[in-house]
């Protein structure tokens, strides 16, 4: 039996993007809503959420403030997602 993960481990950028996308979706918002509220162009919001663009600390702070979530919480969640993506199925980190 192969214990290797079936998918490639998440990069930190992709993990952060997933957290930001989950925050947006859980609030019933679209990327354009985040764009208008934060001043970032919609394309940038999408690229960050897909992990195609590494957000600056300022961008992460602005998104965190918009969602009303401490940046530390977002970083911890992203690290947990990333770690889970590197853990073989059936095992716990």
Sequence positions of predicted segments:
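A short, Lys/Arg-rich alpha-helix, primarily the initiator
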Residues: 1-26
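Short, charged recognition helix plus adjacent turn
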Residues: 2-5, 65, 75-93
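Conserved hydrophobic/aromatic packing and binding residues within compact polymer-binding modules
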Residues: 20, 34-35, 45-48, 74
């Amino acid at each position: 039996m192969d214990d290797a993960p079936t998918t490639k481990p998440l990069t930190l950028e992709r993990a952060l993007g997933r957290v930001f996308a989950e925050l947006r979706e859980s609030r019933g918002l679209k990327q354009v809503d985040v764009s208008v509220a934060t001043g970032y162009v919609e394309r940038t919001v999408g690229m960050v959420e897909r992990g195609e663009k590494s957000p600056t600390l300022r961008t992460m702070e602005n998104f965190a403030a918009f969602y009303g979530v401490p940046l530390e919480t977002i970083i911890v969640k992203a690290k947990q997602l990333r770690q889970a993506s590197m853990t073989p199925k059936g095992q716990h980190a």
